Amino acid sequence: MKLTTIPNEFKEAAPVIREINAQGFEAYFVGGSVRDALLNKPIHDVDIATSAYPEEIKQIFKRTVDVGIEHGTVLVLMEDQQYEVTTFRTESTYQDFRRPDEVTFVRSLKEDLKRRDFTINALALDSTGEIIDLFDGIEDLTNQTIRAVGNPHERFHEDALRMMRGLRFASQLDFKIEEKTLAAIAEFHPLLEKISVERITIEFVKMLLGVNRQGGLAPFIETECYQYCPKLREQGAGLFRLMDLPARQIETEAEAWTLLIQSLNLPEAEIRSFLKAWKLSNQLIQNVSQLVRGLRFRLSNDWQPMMLYELGEESAVLVERLLYYYQQESQVQVTKELVKALPIHQRHELAITGKDLLAVLEETPGKWLGELIAEIEQHVVEGSLENKQEVLLSFAKKQRSKGEKA
């Protein structure tokens, strides 16, 4: 089979392959880029596999960088582009179920392709657009099937993360996992405990953001892979609730975590530790915590000025978008107007500062100062105090006077 239209990404990288070919070696585009080209999807990373050994590649090209030479990968720099070129290889046993104990360079494309995870990723493409399909990957693409290359038991024992990748592809591509491959995932899912949380998180998030997350979540639950993901062991019912939400694709990672937490009915006090267990960044944890708080408020209330102020426009709009999943009408434009109409949007917009209060009240700093500023801030946001210096200072004097009498 030949590609009728060769994507620009391949055209730009073709000189690398032609140069390797000119020196008597084989070279092909491989992996996800070939799959995505056949599916007419955007191509991200172009990977090249070759029969040339790393030292031979370094002799062919003037500008190279050793980025993973022990695994056969050399970065080739050509004009303003860079391409990863990896030698055909076979791999030995995998003691940690993730990385091979030993890599052996070979001259055979077939030996290289048969160690790959799924047939749809075991495709190669030469510089003329001719596709090399040794494991019926094109047929599986046509039938929208995710099938392990060769024996699925061996593939998942080599690299346990492949199970999560299979579930992710089911969601991303809207494909079905082939029966024997699915059975092997169900059998070997305990091996996921050998995989780092960070790697599991990447695949899990991609699964939630896929075009058919239900198509990934259903086998994720069925095979019990969730039991080896952070803090999900006892959360089967919550995952079913997540799966039952309307099918519209989730747009951002923060929204995905928010919908998951809401489906799990996590108490507010447990949200931070749950997200930390997934090794998320502090910024993302903060954003998601805000979104959950806003969503839970909005599901049973109209917006209140203080809640909008604390969330800010971006988070408030995301909350409105999330209402769709709970059969409530989203009012994005109204929400934007409500936020815009707030008297202030950040504390520094207050007409007074802590220094002003200390000067006028002639007091030393203490806990009282932060509490008083917060009280003033709330009154201004809610419209019960005008944001003018004299008004706010007068209010502050009255409040301190009350405090002294008390």
UniProtKB/Swiss-Prot annotation:
| Entry's family note | Belongs to the tRNA nucleotidyltransferase/poly(A) polymerase family. Bacterial CCA-adding enzyme type 3 subfamily.
- Give the matching Pfam families: PolyA_pol, PolyA_pol_RNAbd, tRNA_NucTran2_2
**According to the UniProt record, what class of enzyme is this?**
transferase
Keywords attached to this Swiss-Prot or TrEMBL record, sorted alphabetically, are:
ATP-binding, Magnesium, Metal-binding, Nucleotide-binding, Nucleotidyltransferase, RNA repair, RNA-binding, Transferase, tRNA processing
Q: Which InterPro entries does this UniProt record tie to the protein?
A: Bact_CCA-adding_enz_type3_sf, CCA-adding_enz_C, CCA-adding_enz_firmicutes, NT_sf, PolA_pol_head_dom, PolyA_RNA-bd
Q: Which organism is it from?
A: Enterococcus faecalis (strain ATCC 700802 / V583)
- Give the matching CDD domains: NT_ClassII-CCAase
Q: What protein name does the entry list?
A: CCA-adding enzyme
